[in-house]
């Protein structure tokens, strides 16, 4: 069994693939038994042919292929499931990362008895670095900060390519991975955090390439990464972060309620019907946002059971809101404060019901 399996996701990398594999194979000089798995993601250039020749030339190299383009995350997942090494890492084919540094990650893995080691671009080694895009770096650091807030890890570089895993750990996690593109990084980080394994970081050098040189990630991937952080981490996030996120969900639903009500009135709808329809729309938005970015959909109930539980809690909290508002008004509280207190109670009650009843999780 090889000591180290390196997954090389490849899409249109004909210019750098040979150099990448040759540099990866140099790891053997450090006494490391090696397996290199190139996963060609249906490249449009000659990458697949080059990879096939490399697999014929070197016994350490294996080639896996996708019949259609699925994305970097899908290519990595394919390789992770096929790896045979004691430790499994990821190596981009674009030469931004130096494969020889995997010896540092392996040393941390062994010395600290770690389960996962991240190679951080922001724990600075003592050498010069190439300076490129401020906003790209800022986006990476911001996404790492938000990821840490929801996973309760203390990483400096969640988006790094260099992640080293014990094979038994990653092959337990890999079948659950869903992200096919650059959402892989926040998803795998969330699931590593949920697994409760020992995570370490060590400094690595990084030689970024420009967009003119073939860099593929863009701002849309950053937005999707933010969604992935919430979608895969929020349901087990620290309670204050869940409450904060639910505040924004509630705010969005409230805006839909108000906007829908005023729009329906302006369209000539009866006041009572406008109130009811706007409330239903707001409840639907609340539910959809809850399952998209905060709680697990169908974690305990079936879809029907979950919707019925949600409807029941909406009715209960609607009655609480009505009764509390009427009661406070009867005690002489002004309408503004009566509704404000009822809204606060409703926010707390709705959150508790969502978390403990509607979207409860099996333990």
Predicted regions and their residues:
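Acceptor/aglycone-binding surface of glycosyltransferases and processive sugar-polymer synthases
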Residues: 66-82, 87, 99-182, 209-220, ...
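A conserved acidic beta->alpha catalytic loop
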Residues: 40-49, 95
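Short, acidic, metal-binding catalytic loop of nucleotide-sugar glycosyltransferases
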Residues: 23-33
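Conserved donor nucleotide-binding strand/loop of the catalytic core
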Residues: 34-37, 48-82
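A conserved hydrophobic helix/loop-capping motif in glycosyltransferases and polysaccharide synthases
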Residues: 4-13, 20, 27, 39
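Acidic helix N-cap motif at the loop->helix transition within catalytic regions
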Residues: 15-19, 45-54
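Hydrophobic helical membrane-anchoring modules
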Residues: 1-3, 152, 176-255, 265-266, ...
